[in-house]
Amino acid sequence: MTSNLNLMAPPRGWEAKYESDGGGVITTSVDQTVNWLLNWGRSNSVWYMLFGLACCAIELMQTGGPRGDLERFGAAPRPSPRSSDLFIIAGTLTYKMATRVKRLYDQMSEPRFVISMGSCSNCGGLFQYAYSVCKGVDQIIPVDVYVPGCPPRPEALLEGLLKIQEKIKSERALGRRGATGG
């Protein structure tokens, strides 16, 4: 896959223009440039934590192997929720396990993203009529990207990771941290 990112070209809005927000604060396009740079760095260093519950977790392991190579997109596995940006839930989620998923999600620092991988974690899948199965991870925590399939192919998970990277790039990093001009 090729990237259309040109690191040599400055981002849009680099021209020197000054705006006032009416409160006496003058913002320049430097804010936009720093915002672009922060989002570029965050989107290309996504650290994920896997919560594998069933056969979809095997597909994630295959994606992390030499053929899928998640690390070429900047994604690296982390064992702790405190050091991860992305939470990948793969497999059938039961109500008993849902409290642990919520606890792990709450331990992640902002900004945090979630990929629901496979039919079982998206909607309950084959086991959706069982009394103990949660009918989707989105009933417990907010989900950013759904990866369909039973089990999904490694390419589908890579596409989901690219969607997360696009979402990170479109955010406003400076405004979220309370800096001026945001």
From Swiss-Prot:
Residue ranges the record marks as coiled coil: none
Binding site for [4Fe-4S] cluster: 55-56, 120, 150
Positions of transmembrane segments: none
Membrane topology of the entry: Peripheral membrane protein
Top-rank taxon, per record: Bacteria
Keywords of this entry: 4Fe-4S, Cell inner membrane, Cell membrane, Iron, Iron-sulfur, Membrane, Metal-binding, NAD, Quinone, Translocase, Transport, Ubiquinone
Enzyme's top EC category: translocase
Details of cofactor binding: Binds 1 [4Fe-4S] cluster.
Entry EC number(s): 7.1.1.-
Entry's localization field: Cell inner membrane
Cystine residue pairs: none
Annotated catalysed reactions: a quinone + NADH + 5 H(+)(in) = a quinol + NAD(+) + 4 H(+)(out)
GO CC term, one of those recorded: plasma membrane
GO MF annotation: an example: quinone binding
Pfam families for the chain: Oxidored_q6
GO annotation (BP), single: aerobic respiration
UniProt cross-references to Gene3D superfamilies, sorted A to Z: 3.40.50.12280
Cross-referenced InterPro entries: NADH_UbQ_OxRdtase-like_20kDa, NADH_UQ_OxRdtase_20Kd_su
This protein's record includes keyword Translocase: yes
Cofactor: [4Fe-4S] cluster
Family: Belongs to the complex I 20 kDa subunit family.
Cross-referenced HAMAP family: NDH1_NuoB
Subunit text: NDH-1 is composed of 14 different subunits. Subunits NuoB, C, D, E, F, and G constitute the peripheral sector of the complex.
Function: NDH-1 shuttles electrons from NADH, via FMN and iron-sulfur (Fe-S) centers, to quinones in the respiratory chain. The immediate electron acceptor for the enzyme in this species is believed to be ubiquinone. Couples the redox reaction to proton translocation (for every two electrons transferred, four hydrogen ions are translocated across the cytoplasmic membrane), and thus conserves the redox energy in a proton gradient.
Protein name per UniProt: NADH-quinone oxidoreductase subunit B 2
Source species of the chain: Sorangium cellulosum (strain So ce56) (Polyangium cellulosum (strain So ce56))
Gene (name only): nuoB2
